[in-house]
């Protein structure tokens, strides 16, 4: 499953913070302080922007394989209305985020899905059921150490999963008609991390079980830049639940129906053959996973990034796979390779801007460039880069990204002597920051990290 790394990488070109470094909520770190309301506004997902022929290939690759590479012989889905039950101690923002997600699935994917009434007992519900259970992270990782959140078929709660964790009952490749699934989410992490888990895991409970690094426009991608279900994802789910498809179909049977379905549901994607990405070697995927992993330290991660870039160039790619390889190589490069890293980062941004959904990745690169500009006292450049990135961060509802950009921008304003504007921007960003980083202590740590860069720039300017 996803959540290998945090959505935001550590500031600067030299490192990328893994998810394990995101501060968790606890009583000593302000977890009991009410979180200001973060309001992302009306959902405005990035649209499906690729030719239908490409998305047909993506559907088949996502739908007929597991993340591990194991094949899935038969198409599977729920038949009929799906209901969602919540159990455990759901954090304050989680249920509102769940309701927002379910409304999007109804409106954008056309799926009949809704919450069970709070008083209803999941065990008494005879229909299709997805249970979302909130648990302490420690309890989850004692059983599944590598997963931050995940979804399991044919169980209704944690005890049911633990009792059957070595049983073929929970083997997704054996499921044809889905009737029950349980999503397990840590209750003691940030609101944004919880929201992101809900989007991907419920998306997988309903639809595809695979992730593809080359899909820059999808949450079904372990690079973690898309944090909520995109237009591509919603279109895929709408096709997934079209009446022309039925559980038990083979890959060839589904493939025969997909072009007509996509052309009907996405008329603007008609008539273009699109690009054929070719096979992505498993060795490249493993190298990317190593570069993104929190295990093994910086040296091992850097080696993974270098190997991924070498493999991408050997393959002759000029798509999001090369862009991701360049980006990770730049972020993990040692300080004495700063010039080469900058060139790689700029090349990655150019490739991402030419890729559907890649504007999100390019906006993250703008943030990294803004940090470098701030360190050099180039306040005008900081304001230009952050202004370009902020609409994408807001549109994709990435609160941590929004807050980080605002804090960087505030330091640039302070460099220009616009202290009142800087203070107002920091204050206005607190709701997004608390949602994205979780606790007051975590917000303060991020603000202080950026403030130190701004302070150093002011000291240099005073010399």
Residue ranges and their predicted role:
Residues 346, 384-391, 417-437:
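TPR/TPR-like (Sel1-like) alpha-helical repeat modules
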């Amino acid at each position: 499953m996803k959540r290998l790394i945090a959505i935001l990488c550590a500031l600067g070109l030299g490192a990328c913070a893994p998810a394990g470094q995101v501060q968790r909520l606890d009583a000593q770190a302000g977890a009991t302080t009410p979180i200001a309301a973060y309001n992302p506004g009306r959902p405005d997902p990035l649209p499906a922007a690729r030719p239908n022929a490409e998305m047909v290939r993506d559907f088949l690759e996502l739908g007929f394989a597991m993340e591990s590479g194991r094949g899935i012989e038969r198409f599977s889905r729920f038949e009929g209305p799906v209901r969602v039950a919540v159990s455990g101690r759901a954090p304050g923002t989680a249920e509102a985020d769940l309701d927002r997600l379910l409304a999007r699935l109804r409106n954008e994917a056309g799926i009949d899905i809704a919450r069970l009434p709070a008083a209803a007992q999941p065990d008494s519900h005879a229909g299709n059921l997805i249970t979302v259970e909130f648990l302490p992270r420690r309890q989850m990782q004692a059983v599944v150490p590598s997963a931050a959140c995940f979804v399991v078929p044919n169980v209704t709660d944690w005890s049911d999963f633990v009792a059957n964790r070595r049983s073929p009952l929970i083997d997704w490749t054996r499921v044809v008609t889905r009737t029950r699934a349980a999503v397990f989410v840590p209750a003691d992490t940030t609101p944004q991390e919880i929201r992101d888990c809900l989007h991907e895991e419920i998306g997988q409970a309903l639809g595809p079980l695979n992730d593809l690094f080359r899909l820059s426009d999808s949450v079904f991608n372990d690079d973690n830049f898309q944090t909520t279900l995109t237009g591509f994802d919603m279109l895929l789910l709408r096709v997934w639940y079209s009446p022309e498809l039925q559980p038990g179909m083979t890959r060839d049977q589904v493939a025969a129906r997909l072009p007509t379905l996509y052309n009907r549901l996405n008329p603007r994607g008609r008539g273009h053959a699109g690009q054929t990405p070719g096979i992505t070697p498993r060795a490249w995927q493993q190298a990317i996973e190593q570069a993104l992993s929190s295990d093994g330290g910086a040296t091992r991660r850097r080696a993974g990034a270098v190997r991924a870039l070498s493999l991408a160039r050997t393959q002759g790619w000029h798509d999001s796979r090369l862009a991701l390889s360049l980006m990770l190589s730049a972020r993990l490069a040692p300080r004495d390779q700063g010039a080469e890293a900058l060139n790689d980062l700029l090349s990655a941004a150019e490739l991402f801007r030419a890729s559907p959904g890649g504007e999100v990745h390019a906006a993250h690169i703008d943030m990294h460039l803004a940090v470098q500009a701030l360190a050099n006292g180039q306040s005008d450049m900081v304001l230009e880069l952050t202004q370009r990135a902020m609409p994408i961060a807001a549109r994709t509802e990435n609160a941590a990204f929004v807050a980080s950009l605002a804090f960087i921008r505030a330091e640039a304003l302070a460099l220009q002597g616009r202290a009142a504007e800087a203070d107002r921007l920091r204050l206005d960003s607190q709701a997004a920051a608390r949602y994205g980083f979780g606790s007051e202590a975590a917000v303060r740590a991020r603000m202080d990290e950026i403030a130190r860069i701004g302070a150093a720039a002011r000291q240099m300017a005073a010399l």
